[in-house]
Amino acid sequence: MHAILGASEACIATHPSDMCVALAALDAKVHVTGPTGERTLAFADFHRLPGNTPQRDTNLQPNEIVTAVELPPQGFASNYTYLKIRDRLSYAFALVSIAAALELEGDRIKEVRLALGGVAHKPWRDTAAEAALRGQTATQAAFTNAAELLLRDAKGYEHNSFKIELARLGIVRALSQAARGTPQSQSRKNIA
């Protein structure tokens, strides 16, 4: 199913990985080595949008290889979820997936990470939506506002416009689950 964010005239394919969505949400770093030495990329900068060169999925330079992926320590141990919405329970790419992690102080959001899969050519993060949640009370209204902000530039095509509303509902659900500390079970699928 095609992209609703970050697409170009040359490519509307979506990135299929679940792990990359989680790594994007956790602010992972990618260590690479090549002919000019070693360098480190923020995971958000590792994958690229298609633009006019959709054959290039990453920002690796010629002859570079990934040597390590680093996960920084975070306080998301009990307030996280990964929600994967797909056509069937097994062997299916996500129509929409959401990695959500919250650090709460009481019912206030101190820190938040939110990444989407199945919606763009790369794992999708919008730091403006995350910033809008910081300091807010963890409520459905706050989560709905963040979803609206994150999807403000979403563009559906005839066959996939439903993904915008699916993503909106999924974001609210994932953030609500993370706030409650109840990760989504992959054996049951509740959206509303």
Predicted region positions:
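C-terminal structural segment of proteins
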Residues: M1-A192
